[in-house]
From Swiss-Prot:
PROSITE patterns, sorted: TRANSKETOLASE_1, TRANSKETOLASE_2
Record organism: Prochlorococcus marinus (strain NATL1A)
Enzyme class: transferase
Record field: catalytic activity: D-glyceraldehyde 3-phosphate + pyruvate + H(+) = 1-deoxy-D-xylulose 5-phosphate + CO2
Protein task: Catalyzes the acyloin condensation reaction between C atoms 2 and 3 of pyruvate and glyceraldehyde 3-phosphate to yield 1-deoxy-D-xylulose-5-phosphate (DXP).
Primary gene name: dxs
Metabolic or biological pathway: Metabolic intermediate biosynthesis; 1-deoxy-D-xylulose 5-phosphate biosynthesis; 1-deoxy-D-xylulose 5-phosphate from D-glyceraldehyde 3-phosphate and pyruvate: step 1/1
NCBIfam families hit by this protein: dxs, PRK05444.2-2
Cofactor stoichiometry and binding remark: Binds 1 Mg(2+) ion per subunit. Binds 1 thiamine pyrophosphate per subunit.
InterPro entries: Dxylulose-5-P_synthase, THDP-binding, Transketo_C/PFOR_II, Transketolase-like_Pyr-bd, Transketolase_BS, Transketolase_C, Transketolase_CS
Protein name: 1-deoxy-D-xylulose-5-phosphate synthase
Length: 628
């Protein structure tokens, strides 16, 4: 069968193992061809090709529901569910999404982008199914990294309490998340990968016992009891953990043996109640470079398939904000042993891997456990440690109660560095960092700031670490502005003090963080129309520099705020609230992300669609204030 001609995953039914293996080869070929050209997640999907094929061969996907955790591993799913011919548009504007979207396909039953949600969603569907008296299978496919997340363990705890609710959890154990997973559970899983599989008493044996004359029916309960006893002896330690939580455990199964996988999934479907099938896979399977460097090939920009090397950018770029942060933190840690960097399984993305290599004793990776990371930092701060929690803006949302309850209310000196703040591009709505300005500015005792460039980032990092209270700074994805960097001798900024960059009498533009340089460019465009602008780099949103901003607003009489975040409760809202509270009544235009989801596209395309380029912002300003 040609994969390009497959119109429905049910067409896998009845194919011989050799034919399914050929489909697997075609999936890998298409996967590699597209990701090498346009970028995307590589290793996770390559590792679950056989798992996906075998699972789908045992299901009726017109009715059965499969929930994929995170979405990194769902490219084979997409190729088998009608998106083969559109797959060249992966992660491109109006193309196939890199993650799961309910609006994209009837086979995407639950959206995903963050980890550890699949078991909860699948269990919810299973409970709904049973309440409605319907009959279909609910399956969650979750990686061993995502299984370390508290939400996944909460769902397992609940599912195990429902012995009459059929639910299949497929544990895709590749001994990795983005980077190697951490924690006791990961250690147990690694031990299990090398254990012999648990063997199950076959249905035929059970049927034979049932058919014994006189004693068959009476022996059924004894048979079940014996089976349970044998299983408790046979199931290795981590399997016993799941068994004690109420799951029937099967595995570990070779995740690249379609025949063995198919037999195991068919057996699992017959059990009833919650079942855990433990599948051992190899991340990056089938592409030697990805198998050899599973961290580096988790996700890739475009690369040469033959050599495995990334295709370099045509124009040199300054170091990323993330890299500058990581390098600066290493130097600060060298000077102060009380500083500790904390990540939640995102060492490479946040550049804390630089600290991990340089000073491992001052580095902590908690795994996919954002809530724990925040409160852990709070506990450290209570004892005189200076924790720096580096975390993506979108992932810090998962620990909002901890920010308020454990850090803000107690006024603990913890530094939060929010990476990927603002528009992130091809990862789409689940990963846009558009909400942190709003959700941070209302937390008690927090000081919140954003640098205009990488030099100011260095100063703000020092400001946060030296501040005797909770603080947060946001940095965007991608390259810096090319500002000169200091190797040492950084000084703290005056908290709550803005920077006036340009002076003009016709318009006040206040930029926050990554929007300061676009504000400067916008002012230059407006100057061509005779509009002279005062441009202020706000630096801080909490506290806001009311003295500087109020004076300029009253003097000039026309105000524009610019932010790379949602307008709802954002930076512009803070400025307008401050004006209102102080009886300053001036026309104000707030520019930022409106009340809408930002879909996957390049960052530049997203900014164009939102009207956030300097040219488009200049047009908005001219229309608002009649500058013609």
């Amino acid at each position: 069968m040609r994969l390009s001609q497959l119109s429905h995953p049910n067409e896998l039914h009845g194919l011989a193992i050799s034919e399914l293996e050929d489909v697997a080869c075609q999936i890998r070929e298409r996967h590699l061809q597209v990701v090498s050209t346009s970028g995307g997640h590589l290793g996770p999907g390559l590792g679950v090709v056989e798992l996906t094929i075998a699972l789908y061969q045992t299901l009726d996907l017109d009715v059965d529901k499969v929930i994929w955790d995170v979405g990194h591993q769902a490219y084979p799913h997409k190729l088998l569910t009608g998106r083969y011919n559109r797959f060249d548009s992966l992660r491109q504007q109006k193309g196939v999404a890199g993650y799961l979207k309910r609006t994209e396909s009837k086979f995407d039953h639950f959206g995903a982008g963050h980890a550890s949600t699949s078991i909860s969603a699948a269990l919810g569907m299973a409970i709904a199914r049973d309440r409605k008296g319907e009959d279909y299978k609910c399956v969650a496919v979750i990686g061993d990294g995502a299984l370390t997340g508290g939400m996944a363990l909460e769902a397992i705890n609940h599912a195990g309490h429902l012995p009459k609710t059929p639910l299949l959890v497929v544990l895709n154990d590749n001994d990795m998340s983005i980077s190697p997973p951490v924690g006791a559970l990961s250690t147990y899983l690694n031990r299990m990968r090398h254990s012999p599989p648990v063997q199950f008493i076959s249905d035929s044996v059970q049927e034979s016992v049932k058919n014994l004359p006189f004693m068959g029916d009476a022996m059924q309960e004894e048979f079940k009891s014996l089976t349970g006893s044998v299983r408790r002896l046979a199931v290795p330690s981590v399997g016993a953990v799941f068994e004690e939580l109420g799951f029937t455990y099967m595995g570990p199964v070779d995740g690249h043996d379609i025949a063995e996988l198919t037999r195991t999934f068919n057996a699992a479907h017959k059990v009833g109640g919650p079942v855990m099938v433990h599948v051992a896979t190899t991340k990056g399977k089938g592409y030697p470079y990805a198998e050899a460097d599973q961290v580096g090939y988790h996700a890739q920009s475009s690369f040469d398939l033959t050599t495995g090397k990334s295709i370099p950018s045509k124009t040199p770029k300054p170091p990323s904000f993330s890299k500058v942060f990581g390098q600066t933190l290493v130097k600060l840690c060298e000077q102060d042993s009380k500083i500790v960097g904390i990540t939640a399984a995102m060492a490479e993305g946040t550049a804390l891997n630089l600290l991990q290599k340089a000073i491992p004793d001052q580095y902590v990776d908690v795994g996919i456990a954002e809530q724990h990371a925040v409160t852990l930092a709070g506990g450290m701060a209570c004892e005189g440690i200076k924790p720096v929690v580096a975390i993506y803006s979108t992932f810090l949302q998962r620990a909002y109660d901890q920010l308020i309850h454990d850090i803000g209310i107690q006024n603990l000196p913890v530094t939060f560095v929010l990476d990927r703040a603002g528009i992130v591009g091809a990862d789409g709505p689940t990963h846009q960092g558009q909400y942190d300005i709003s959700y941070l500015r209302c937390i008690p005792n927090f000081t919140v700031m954003a640098p205009k460039d990488e030099s100011e980032l260095q100063q703000m990092l020092v400001t946060c670490i030296n501040h005797n209270g909770p603080s947060a700074l946001r940095i965007p994805r991608g390259s810096g502005e090319g500002a000169a960097l200091m190797e040492e001798g950084w000084e703290s900024l005056e908290i709550g003090k803005a920077e006036t960059i340009e002076e003009g009498e016709n318009l006040l533009i206040i930029g926050y963080g990554s929007m300061v340089f676009p504000a400067i460019k916008t002012a230059a465009i407006l100057k061509e129309f005779g509009v002279n602008c005062t441009v202020i780099n706000a630096r801080f949103i909490r506290p806001l520099d009311e003295d500087t901003i109020h004076e300029a607003a009253k003097r000039i009489g026309k105000v524009v705020t610019m932010e790379e975040g949602t307008l709802l409760g954002g930076f512009g809202s803070a400025v307008v609230e401050s004006f209102n509270d102080n009886d300053i009544f001036v026309p104000t235009l707030r520019i930022g992300i409106p009340d809408k989801l930002v879909d996957h596209a390049t960052p530049q395309q997203s900014k164009e669609s939102l009207g956030l380029t300097p040219e488009m912002m200049a047009d908005q300003i001219r229309n608002k204030f009649n500058f013609n």
